Amino acid sequence: YGRGVFIGDITPLQEVSAEILVEPFHLFGIEPRPYYGFRALGNFHLYGHKYLEVPNEPDGLVINYYLREAQKGGATITIKDISGVEVASRTGTSEAGINRVLWNMRPGEDSGGDGHSGFRRREGPPPLAPGDYRITVEVADERATMIGTIRERIW
């Protein structure tokens, strides 16, 4: 069609430097986000190939980390509230390069959903309250912790 546009989150690329690329492991900053819970009603696929559609950003906190070399086994992501109580956990890839895991802001282990919303009944527990959460990524012998913030939704 000739006028295509690629939309992608390049946040980790903006943070990359020569120093990071020589490290065996690096956890990038985590952008604070509110939980939106987008929903849509209707069949928007009736327009065929003439309808340009770009999906919304995922509804969750995106955790990006860099590995200089691929590691055996996956990454373990642990999310704790500010008092140190574990509220969620995820597993991630351990491939060389930038790896990405989405936390859908819900408690539990890999608890339902890829962060994309639609018009359907939600499965799993409701999202956690706004606030700061300690997010720890462990791969092989490497470990790093960052604060991830669920912001309050303001409309």
Where are the language model's segments positioned?
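Beta-propeller blade termini and top-face loops
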Residues: 1-52, 58-61, 66, 70
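Extracytoplasmic beta-rich repeat domains
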Residues: 46, 51-53, 57, 102, ...
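Hydrophobic beta-strand positions in extracellular immunoglobulin-like domains
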Residues: 65-67, 105, 139
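Beta-strand-rich binding/interaction modules
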Residues: 61-64, 70-88, 132-136
